[in-house]
């Protein structure tokens, strides 16, 4: 009996080290795959790179490598594994060795084609040269070469080194389930609904196109739940797609049926009848891979009580105004009749895209706020509240920070979501670690911070990417009627912020008072305003003025809110972030595997990754396990250190052997 128990423990221990279910993965280029799983205090990574030279992964807050916190590793010709904590401190792009080595090696080896490293690090290592891993957008940088360094602590081969960077969420990221046999057994049979455009022509010479297509829901006779969706992007169209939004439509069924028989048209033309497509069903933005609903909720497709028609709004962008493409991209929804506990909904909070949203030029920080007032939430959210489980943030080119604030009875709660390193080119759903409860009467604020230093003229709110927007869309359950909760600075507030006292006339409207501005049009005032000296007074007037709330349900404007003009909410207890002192405790010692050249460890490779980037099982050429140490630098050593976990394994082997004898 004892023999079986010990053997089982040994098998489970080894199996647990080699077999990891990764929560996230990203193909950084055709030869570089990174997998990672966030833990409570640290993050575990694995990189699989098609090279037998050195490999590196790093993190920074911008899209350059200067200042990057990097980990570099390789297997040398003597079979020794090297893993080094480095940083890039100047424009040479050469990662320098850190005096503090803060990455913990878990596993590493080579086969005939790939180098594989598995390691972990703290979110905050307390090292000023290391970047904190937070909920912000992180710029992930990578680097690899066909050659290895000549010496462990020396300069890395730089000529022909392959480098790249891309923005990613490392923590608040939707886990994309892999189609393993276990998932297939647990997940019910899914049906798909492809909502695609039909050969939309992007006209040459036009930098923005909003295209709307109405479609009828699938032919189903009972309620289903959408459990995930993803983009379907036509090859060659990716650079021209900014975002796609799927709306529910509930207007006259005959009008919608007529629209569904066409391939679509330009959105929101003045002579078009309103289709009243106000409630968002799904959103895709640049950088997103789609979304998986949590097990307790799904988006309802109901032929009896829900909408039968949907409108796909596609925002095309062509900044060079040189494209003449024909696009058939769209969304793919996966749905099932195995219903989940809750119907999910989308509630969008932000600023109505309108010229009253003004961003002055030449400023490093311009803050704009869109309000979902307590009157809107008080009349639509049940007493038990709603649970927000994911958010997606949206600005155009000037956005640098975004957060969704929550005010309750004069107290500001921690932000529902926040990104102080927002990247407009990467807009992905963030899945919150725990759902956040919103109760009736809560006041929500979508706060966007812009940098307009690159602009010499004002930027106004609007739909074009040259204009700006501020929007945070939340996924929540259970579903309520409220769908769009926007605000807009009132006209008196805008006029006061520009020093205008009175208007006169029409077509065009001109300024009557004060006298020094008399006869100017609004456009002339906006263009001639001295933003450099008057920016602070403009900001104070905007913040202290009134705004118009816009509360939309699937039936139209929420009754009782049509004519409201309200002030900024009174916050008696502002939220203050608590910065805990950094505690640099050593990471738990991890298992490093001691392997011979002929052993097949069952390489921990993503089974669904591209064949060109998959490490083949059982083809180990060299495999190492001890963390190299060259004094304090973590370089190479002529003697192999044996971690305590390896000693435990050795003792277990001896015990098992003795017991069997």
Model-found features: residue ranges?
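Extracellular-facing/secreted segment signature in eukaryotic proteins
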Residues: 15-186, 259-287, 291, 440, ...
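Solvent-exposed, flexible loop/coil segments flanking beta-strands in beta-rich domains
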Residues: 26, 174-240, 320-397, 460-542, ...
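Noncatalytic modules at the cell exterior or secretory-pathway interfaces
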Residues: 116, 227, 301-316, 436-450
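C-terminal GPI-anchoring signal of eukaryotic secretory precursors
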Residues: 603-646
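Cleavable C-terminal sorting propeptides in eukaryotic secreted/cell-surface proteins
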Residues: 637-661
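Short, surface-exposed beta-strand/strand-loop-strand elements in extracellular ectodomains
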Residues: 243-251, 400-411
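Short acidic/polar inter-strand loop motif in beta-rich domains
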Residues: 125-127, 317-321, 449-458
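Beta-sandwich interaction modules
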Residues: 278, 282-304, 423-440
